[in-house]
Swiss-Prot record:
Species name: Bombina maxima
GO-annotated biological processes: defense response to bacterium; defense response to fungus; killing of cells of another organism
Signal peptide annotation: 1-18
Protein name: Maximins 2/H1
Protein purpose: Maximin-2 shows antibacterial activity against both Gram-positive and Gram-negative bacteria. It also shows antimicrobial activity against the fungus C.albicans, but not against A.flavus nor P.uticale. It has little hemolytic activity.
Modified residues (Asparagine amide): N70
Cellular localisation: Secreted
Gene Ontology, cellular component aspect: extracellular region
Tissues where this protein is expressed: Expressed by the skin glands.
Keyword terms, alphabetized: Amidation, Amphibian defense peptide, Antibiotic, Antimicrobial, Cleavage on pair of basic residues, Cytolysis, Fungicide, Hemolysis, Secreted, Signal
C-alpha cells in the first residue's frame, strides 16, 4: 500500500509541475507578444517622426541649394559656397577617390553643385537620421 501511495503522490506532483511549467510558458509567450506589439508601436511612432524630420531636412537642403544656384550672392554667400564646394569634394574623395581627383581638376559650376547636393542628400542624411533616431530611442527608453 505504501508503494502505491508514493507512486500516486509522485504522479500528482509531476503532473502539477508540468501544468505549472506549461502555464509559465504561456504566460511568457503572452508577455512576449505584448512586448513585441508595444515595440512595433514605438517603432511606428519613431518612423513617423523620423520621416517628418527627414522631409524637413530634405526641403531645407533643396531650398539652400536653390538659393545658392538661382540667387545673387554676396561675398559672404560666396565664401559659404566655396566651403560647401570643399565639403562636397571631401565627401567625394571619401566615397569615390578616383572620381574626386577628376572633378577637382575641372572645377565646379553651379549646376554640378546642385546635382551633387541632391546626390549627397541621401549619404549625408543617413548618419544624421541614425543619430536622431538614437537620441529619440534613448529618450523613449528613459520615458518608458
Amino acid at each position: 500500500m505504501n508503494f502505491k501511495y508514493i507512486v500516486a503522490v509522485s504522479f500528482l506532483i509531476a503532473s502539477a509541475y508540468a501544468r505549472s511549467e506549461e502555464n509559465d510558458e504561456q504566460s511568457l509567450s503572452q508577455r512576449d507578444v505584448l512586448e513585441e506589439e508595444s515595440l512595433r508601436e514605438i517603432r511606428g511612432i519613431g518612423t513617423k517622426i523620423l520621416g517628418g524630420v527627414k522631409t524637413a531636412l530634405k526641403g531645407a537642403l533643396k531650398e539652400l541649394a536653390s538659393t545658392y544656384v538661382n540667387g545673387k550672392r554676396t561675398a559672404e554667400d560666396h565664401e559659404v559656397m566655396k566651403r560647401l564646394e570643399a565639403v562636397m569634394r571631401d565627401l567625394d574623395s571619401l566615397d569615390y577617390p578616383e572620381e574626386a581627383a577628376e572633378r577637382e581638376t575641372r572645377g565646379f559650376n553651379q549646376e554640378e553643385i546642385a546635382n551633387l547636393f541632391t546626390k549627397k542628400e541621401k549619404r549625408i542624411l543617413g548618419p544624421v537620421i541614425s543619430t536622431i533616431g538614437g537620441v529619440l530611442g534613448g529618450l523613449l527608453k528613459n520615458l518608458g
